[in-house]
Amino acid sequence: MTPKPNTTSPTNNLPLLSKDSPDIESLLILNPKVQDKANAVPSAVTKKNKHNWKRNEEKGCGSTCGESKLKNDFRDIKHTTLSERGALKEAMRCLKCADAPCQKSCPTQLDVKSFITSISNKNYYGAARQILSDNPLGLTCGMICPTSDLCVGSCNLQASEEGAINIGGLQQYACDVFKQMNVRQIVSKEVRENRNASHKEQVALIGCGPASISCASFLARLGYTDITIYEKRAYIGGLSSAEIPQFRLPYDVVDFEIQLARDIGVQIETNRPLGKDGLTLAKLKEQGAAAVFIGIGNPEPKIDPLFEGLTIENGFYTSKNYLPAVAAASKPGMCGCKRTPLPTMRGRVVVLGAGDTAMDCATSALRCGASRVTIAFRKGFTGIRAVPEEMEAAKEEKCEFLPFSAPRKINVKDGRIVSIEFNKTEQDDNGKWYEDEEQIVILKCDYVISAFGSTLKEDAVLSALQPCQLNKWGGIEVDSTTQQTSEKWVFAGGDVAGVAETTVESVNDGKIAAWNMHRYIQSLHGNQVSETPELPQFFTPIDEVDISVDMCGVKFENPFGLASAPPTTSGPMCRRAFEQGWGFILTKTYGLDKDLVTNVSPRIVRGSTSGPLYGPNQGSFMNIELISEKSCEYWLQCIRELKRDHPTKIVIASIMCVYNKADWIELATKSEEAGADILELNLSCPHGMGEKGMGLACGQSPEIVKEICRWVRACVKIPFFPKMTPNITDVREIARAARDGGASGVTATNTVSSLMHMKADGNAWPAIGSTKRTTYGGMSGSAIRPIAMKAVSSIANELDGFPIMATGGIESAETGLGFLMAGASVLQVCSAVQNQDFTVVDDYCTGLKALLYLSGAESLKNWDGQSPPIEKHQKGKPILLQGQKKMPFFGKYRDEREKLEAIKLSESNLLDTENYHFASRPDTQVSRVPTVEDVIGKALPRIGPYVTLDNQEQKVAIIDDDMCINCGKCYMTCNDSGYQAITFDPVTHQPHVTEDDCTGCTLCYSVCPIPECIEMVPRTGPWKAPKRGVKPSVEPGTPKVVKVDQRGRVILDTTGGMQ
């Protein structure tokens, strides 16, 4: 037998201090332990146990039994829906490819790479702006696009094990956050100032569906001021409102996108059908319309002659009367009704068709009470036209599928449908399909919904479309490259034009039509317009925010520039950077020709700080690259050319010399004469150059730094900034020496000296030559951001008002704003470009504008930058039942929760708008937008020495059971790295914080995978002294801080006074 361990001290019979007490041992029962034996549990037991933990559907019964559990449940069903956490994780996974195939596969040509880059940088406005610039219905399309057949189908990550990016979900998330910002669209200043008489021409659009909304939006962005959409229904949105179910596309989304169009002058008139009340093409032209767009869809259903005479009273629907009836009863805000009953669907429903509409009919039927839904179609599963996303949704909701079935007869008894008969379909060896009347299937049913497509056949409408020519299928004859009809002034798009089969293709029809309508209208005024579309982008007041900044009398268009690094290896690279929008560049550090270098290779490697993460978004790089290999005259000439061609951009010459007065004077003078706006003195290169008596060899000595600064100050008039090294005990000493030597400011900081990869055979990476030697290199990237942030803030606090150029881990507008608030004036970027390309600057500029604008909005004070408050959710979707103790989201608890949810849904009013965010005008009001100068140093008053912190305002952790996914990470870290203050229920796996034991260390909060599932809240009750283990001879208090001087030094009261 294993001897029982001692629990008391052999000397004084007291409990062992180095052993957990019995209550802690009980708490640790589920804490991981190293296993020294294999596990063995009978399968009969594991088969039973697994049901206690399942989060997915049980396999087995393939259909619903009795009334559908989905009745009245119009909550979001999309697997693509994301929370902020999910969106950031997915966006970080994106490769942001060159010549991205996802964009090529998008009908509207969305710049997918760019908007996902913005999402990964938490610039949701920038992402939404990119999306809405190319697709005014970006939120709708993010929700319902058949992405597997479009962008996602072309994603290069399809070639990897982890699979393609959830592009639709990311698009939905970014646009939804912008929707919550409630910022109006405006016409850009450039367009407003260039309007002429042609922009007053009257434009009419018929039908308020996706194609018309898109067309009208682009025409308004082009500057047209008299745009009217005529809609036959009492509500707007077309098919998006009437036929796409609420659980896929909520009405508040449609309302939001139409409000954006109204913001820029688009007028909408409802109850104006084509063919009635004088609304015809001829009348519109008589009334002064210069151009007309037809976007009426295909309003009539295709009905098999088999169903002639059948009505709703018999139990027969078409998709064209069923889905609008469901929408009217389930889409809050659509028609202004307070309560409208859903179509009754008790019993068995058969849906005919295999397209997306058929799947919508089937899943809607379950929500109307159907006990069983069968989708019957003529061909096999391989011939289903519905996109995989739609079919999988129907399958998951237990719809049945009946392939190879063509309806032959509907049986009616006492005026109600009782069954439907099918012939089996076959395909011969030549690929021709036929019906085999010898193989008959009779399916009992109570309702039949026909979803065999739609057409345009109403005589009044066809008459109103004259003189437009019709094609042989009865649709409008349209030029598919311009959307122009046989009449030059009439254009058409969407279903009625015959090419578009999806919402996004309809949107694109409207987009193409808008440009060609613009060309046509301009031609009437004798103005020539390019055949290649030049459509204005989406624009809001955010885009008018000024992010320029003055530093040392030099005006920067924006605070983002390229550091002296690989992105500025050559003059042409610097020029391209300016063309993409960077506010300034630093040349690659150059010296006199006598100090020219030759680099080794390999020399720039991915860091080890990101673990096994390959591809973009590396947390760090390590380089052993030296300064520029190009001559001094090369760089002087490049500076001359860049300043000549880009006079408003700022060129900063990065220079380096040995510790020699004549050399510094010569190089600084030549650089100033070439036209450099500012000099940066590279006194901090951490590898290679120090061994030559340059770089770090100069920058670690305050005396040398001060003297070099004096030499340069004496010979140039332009500002200069010595570049600080982080490889020193106190960077403030070097900064102070630079200031005392006459420097205009400093750059903080250079890379951190490091050694990255060590392989199993003892070789490091990078390994040079046949001997595989290596050296210490400079680490850059987000991994050094905390070091750089500390350097910037400490210098700013030490030298009040001293200008600082920050560098080190700046990779977004948000991180850049952090450096500005820590005291920096402008921001240098390197590793973020190495991870991506020069175009990231557009994301940084829009992101900074948005951050400044939103900070001035009182109504958004509870936002964290561009991140809205986190609502309680599971899988990115709101929780219907909140505060249900002891009821996690798995096993039997999941079943119990679903039953309670069904009860609540059955009692709810589906048309209640309370839980939806509808667009409101006036939009978010901003009192004053801060400038960049306003935010510089804003955080400094709250950054200081440790002894200024109050150790009696304690906080403790609290865990939200509604958001918890029961992983136990908080429990484990508290046990093995903290204070054993969290219990973990063995049955529900719900963690709970014991407040008396919690010290507020925040480890649990830090490792929790769900943001804000754990919150740090003030401790209740009076302050309690820490558990000392053994009672101290004296219980210390907190020293009183008498004074904190400007250099951060703390003066304490040492007379014994304690707080």
Swiss-Prot record:
Record bears the keyword NAD: no
Cofactor: [4Fe-4S] cluster; FAD; FMN
Keyword 4Fe-4S in record: yes
Binding site for [4Fe-4S] cluster 3: 964, 967, 970, 974
Domain spans labelled 4Fe-4S ferredoxin-type: 84-118, 955-987, 989-1019
Descriptive protein name: Dihydropyrimidine dehydrogenase [NADP(+)]
Originating organism: Caenorhabditis elegans
Pfam families linked: DHO_dh, Fer4_20, Fer4_21, Pyr_redox_2
Binding site for [4Fe-4S] cluster 1: 94, 97, 102, 155
Binding site for FAD: 207-211, 231-239, 248, 274, 494-503
Extra facts: Worms lacking dpyd-1 exhibit increased sensitivity (decreased survival) to the chemotherapeutic drug 5-fluorouracil.
An example Gene Ontology CC term for this record: cytoplasm
Pathway of action: Amino-acid biosynthesis; beta-alanine biosynthesis
Binding-site positions, substrate: 623, 682-684, 750-751
PROSITE patterns to which the protein is assigned, alphabetical: 4FE4S_FER_1, 4FE4S_FER_2
Residues bound to [4Fe-4S] cluster 4: 998, 1001, 1004, 1008
InterPro entries assigned: 4Fe4S_Fe-S-bd (IPR017896), 4Fe4S_Fe_S_CS (IPR017900), Aldolase_TIM (IPR013785), Dihydroorotate_DH_cat (IPR005720), DPD_II (IPR028261), FAD/NAD-bd_sf (IPR036188), FAD/NAD-binding_dom (IPR023753), Helical_ferredxn (IPR009051)
